[in-house]
Amino acid sequence: MLKIGSHVSMSGKKMLLAASEEAVSYGANTFMIYTGAPQNTRRKAIEELNIEAGHEHMKAHGIEDIVVHAPYIINIGNTKNPDTFALGVNFLRAEIERTEAIGAKQLVLHPGAHVGAGAEAGLRQIIRGLNEVLTREQTVEIALETMAGKGSECGRTFEELAYIIDGVAYNDKLSVCFDTCHTHDAGYDIVNDFDGVLSEFDRVIGLERLKVLHINDSKNPRGSRKDRHENIGFGHIGFRALNYIVHHPQLADIPKILETPYVGEDKNNKKPPYKHEIAMLRAQTFDDQLLEKIVADTQ
């Protein structure tokens, strides 16, 4: 069964219930949340996340497999500022607790950035951080995301992710989130040779570690190292390639999460594209009028 959804918001008093309601309104059967704003580390207590009501709504609508994303501000690759590293380690420990309480199995993490110290130093620091965070007892896996290589980001290549995994003691608690935009922007040819890329991933990392897919088109050509998401079928990856990935038989059980941009000229009234993009991917037919339909949607 196709597991497809999007990033949704966990906010207000409804929290997890609000996230599930939003996902269902898009025709989704999975979703991804941040436990608070992605730009900061302010978080509500677990008791305020409205988990029980959220679970009831999810169960009623056939949603079992959800994903949590750690905030962007976390950087355990930073060797230059001990406070930034310590904040990342401490926050990740607490985020694992929240993720377990919510009932998600995967916590997606941007591995980190070396901020000028060099890739090797950054990778070693990420390993150090994960070794401080991960425990034998935890049930949540940290899903290291494939990165575009923008700035000093670590995790642009499968080899870098494998290096991190190999250096971590409890690496059975590590998985990978494959982002189509990032992988394309990093230089992998997922448009013309996705099966070749998948084989390379399997050889370097192991396909059994692939637990989350971020499905995004890209505003930039392959290898640009930019990381700018585009709506499905309207970027440099294109609908054919993304549809092939979404329906790939080897990836059937993996949650596919859309993180595509809201649509509209009015910055204060942009519309979420997810209901339309999910329907289009389910139908496996590209709609070149999609953006106009999203803007016209009054729901």
UniProtKB/Swiss-Prot annotation:
Keyword Metal-binding: yes
SMART domains: AP2Ec (SM00518)
GO molecular function, one term: DNA binding
Record-listed Zn(2+) 1 binding positions: 69, 110, 145
A biological process from GO: base-excision repair
Residues bound to Zn(2+) 2: 145, 179, 214, 259
Cofactor binding comment, as recorded: Binds 3 Zn(2+) ions.
Lineage top rank: taxon: Bacteria
InterPro entries tied to this protein: AP_endonuc_2, AP_endonuc_F2_Zn_BS, Xyl_isomerase-like_sf, Xyl_isomerase-like_TIM-brl
Name of a matching Pfam family: AP_endonuc_2
Catalyzed reactions per annotation: Endonucleolytic cleavage to 5'-phosphooligonucleotide end-products
Keyword list, A-Z: DNA damage, DNA repair, Endonuclease, Hydrolase, Metal-binding, Nuclease, Zinc
EC number: 3.1.21.2
Record bears the keyword Zinc: yes
Cofactor: Zn(2+)
Residues annotated as binding Zn(2+) 3: 182, 227, 229
Similarity comment text for this entry: Belongs to the AP endonuclease 2 family.
Biological role: Endonuclease IV plays a role in DNA repair. It cleaves phosphodiester bonds at apurinic or apyrimidinic (AP) sites, generating a 3'-hydroxyl group and a 5'-terminal sugar phosphate.
Descriptive protein name: Probable endonuclease 4
Chain's gene name: nfo
